[in-house]
Amino acid sequence: MSVTTATSGALIFSGASLLVSLFAAASIYSQVSSIWTELDNEIDSFKLLTNDIWGDMINLGAGSASNRIRRQAYGGYGATGTNAPEPQFPQGDKGPLPVPGLPFGPNVSGGSDRCQCTVENTCPTGPDGEEGEQGPDGQDGVDGVPGFDGQDCPDVEQQPSQGCFTCPQGLPGPQGSQGAPGIRGMRGARGQPGYPGRDGQPGMPGEMGPTGAPGDDGAPGASGMKGDDAEKPVGRQGQRGQPGEQGPDGEEGPAGKDAFEGPPGVEGEVGVPGYQGSAGPDGEEGPRGPSGLPGKDAEYCKCPTRDDGGNSHRAWRRKHKRVY
């Protein structure tokens, strides 16, 4: 396997791994976004549902006198599945609606056959306002007239009200504060796969890549046709140019061979006498010199006469081999 093939394989594998990682990251992000959106929708729907239930509970008026009458009319808390008779609306001319348990009835002005109900404000109480300035003390009021003694109410069973139970909806109240987050809902079914996207616009041409490795040698081509003979014009010799500048000194070359011995030169003048040199070594013993003259007579010896012993001194020297 060549280096080029191994490099190409590694690059292709790295690119494929990068594309798969990007696709997986995009898929995970899309799923998380869809789940988050679904949870937000479920939470919003749950808030709306709880708000509706709370509004219905407020409209029912739990703990009020009318609720007690309705419970008693339908059999109380221990009622069975049977329904109480529907309330009967008054027919014909409008008159006072008697309230059970009271000997007198309220004065109701005449009108149409529609239900005469007062609109109750079921909105929650708003925040307390700022404390105002203290006002001046008022004048003492006039003593009231003593009232009449009340009449004892007979002990009668509560009767259902003859009026309508549902009143027209009032004006919407101010928006309440945001409630606590609800319980996380169940995960929904997996959505349908989306449509494939369209191809994007072609990108700008990239930069030129590095020079590739030289390719294999191609097959030798066929021999071409023989060309025409060329003409070689011979030009005239031009004028000699100016001498160029002297170049830099070259490196020192190797030592040359010894030259031939030249002829002896002219004898020079006699030089100045030099300094006296040191004593040389002793030379070899020279030849024996001639015999010396006879010495003087010694004091301890009587000299012979010249006539008697002329050769006595020479004989003595030969005997003792004295060397001078």
From Swiss-Prot:
Amino acid composition bias (Basic residues), ranges on this chain: 314-324
Spans annotated as Triple-helical region: 129-152, 170-229, 235-294
Keyword ATP-binding belongs to the record: no
Span list, region Disordered: 119-324
One of the GO biological process terms: negative regulation of multicellular organism growth
Biased composition (Basic and acidic residues): 296-311
InterPro entries named in the record: Col_cuticle_N, Collagen
Cellular-component GO terms for this entry: annuli extracellular matrix; collagen trimer; cuticular extracellular matrix
Keywords: Collagen, Cuticle, Disulfide bond, Repeat, Signal
Sequence ranges of Low complexity compositional bias: 136-151, 168-181, 210-223, 235-246, 261-273
Quaternary structure (record): Collagen polypeptide chains are complexed within the cuticle by disulfide bonds and other types of covalent cross-links.
Full protein name: Cuticle collagen lon-3
Species for this entry: Caenorhabditis elegans
